[in-house]
Regions:
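Short, active-site-adjacent cap segments at secondary-structure transitions
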Residues: 11, 61-63, 87-88, 155-157
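Glycine-rich phosphate-binding loop signature in dinucleotide/nucleotide-binding domains
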Residues: 44-50, 139-146
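Short, well-ordered beta-to-alpha junction loops that form the rim of enzyme active sites
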Residues: 8, 56-59, 84, 149-154, ...
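Generic beta-sheet signal
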Residues: 2, 52, 145-151
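Generic structural signal for well-ordered alpha-helical scaffold segments
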Residues: 35-43, 129, 133-141
Length: 222
């Protein structure tokens, strides 16, 4: 089983900085979001003596989120901080404001260019995918171990794509994506038919009590 948790709201969200390798910290709201996810996860693990590994991106917003979850679960092991779980490398744009980064942005000819670098020193989509996937599949038996992974939107998307058997060429060909909101929880498991199944996807029910599904909150193409 793989439980994927995106970090909570971070300072780069509120200060209008670029994401990527900007090493932003959780906001108070972000900490509360992750705490809510952790409390709900603790209910799943209560009374269960199952072996669990917790892996987290080494960027502060993810590692701090992982620590909050580990404490709520009463996790006794060591959190594994993994550089390969970082968000897509945005090169020289890391740490810049969104306005500053626009001056360095290299627009691709199409959204499906997989070997294009948006910023000098940054990664291509193919490089990003390979880093995430090769790193995780080499350090863990993803079909058999219980893994709780705290990472970033793009990283979680890449893990989901690989779980579904898709490489980046297929993702681009189908123009496919999944939404991954801050502090959301996604659960991947092998089902009773031995299929790679998605049991939860972008679940934010711990943040939306009393609200609707949020169907009008998504960004639609007009």
């Amino acid at each position: 089983m793989i439980i994927l948790v995106r970090h909570g709201e971070a300072t780069h969200h509120t200060q209008r900085l670029t994401g990527g390798w900007t090493d932003s910290q959780l906001t108070e709201k972000g900490r509360a979001q992750i705490k809510a996810a952790a409390v709900k996860l603790a209910k799943d693990f209560a009374g269960r003596n199952c072996k669990l590994r917790i892996l987290a991106s080494d960027l502060q917003r993810a590692s701090a989120s992982a620590q909050i979850i580990a404490e709520e679960l009463g996790f006794k092991g060591e959190i594994e901080h993994c550089r390969f779980l970082r968000e897509k490398n945005n090169g020289i744009a890391a740490g810049m404001t969104e306005e500053e980064a626009k001056k360095h942005f290299c627009k691709p000819a199409s959204e499906q260019e997989l070997d294009h670098r948006n910023y000098p020193g940054g990664e291509t989509r193919n490089e990003f995918y390979r880093r995430n996937v090769h790193g995780l599949w080499h350090c863990a038996d993803v079909d058999k171990e219980n893994l709780l992974i705290v990472a970033h939107k793009g990283t979680i998307q890449n893990i989901i794509f690989r779980w579904l058997g898709m490489d980046m060429q297929q993702v681009a060909a189908f123009n496919f994506s999944v939404d991954v909101q801050p502090a959301s929880v996604t659960v991947l498991r092998i089902n009773k038919w031995h299929e790679h199944a998605v049991f939860r996807l972008n679940d934010v029910s711990h943040l939306t009590q009393g609200k609707g599904f949020g169907v009008f909150e998504f960004k639609y193409e007009k």
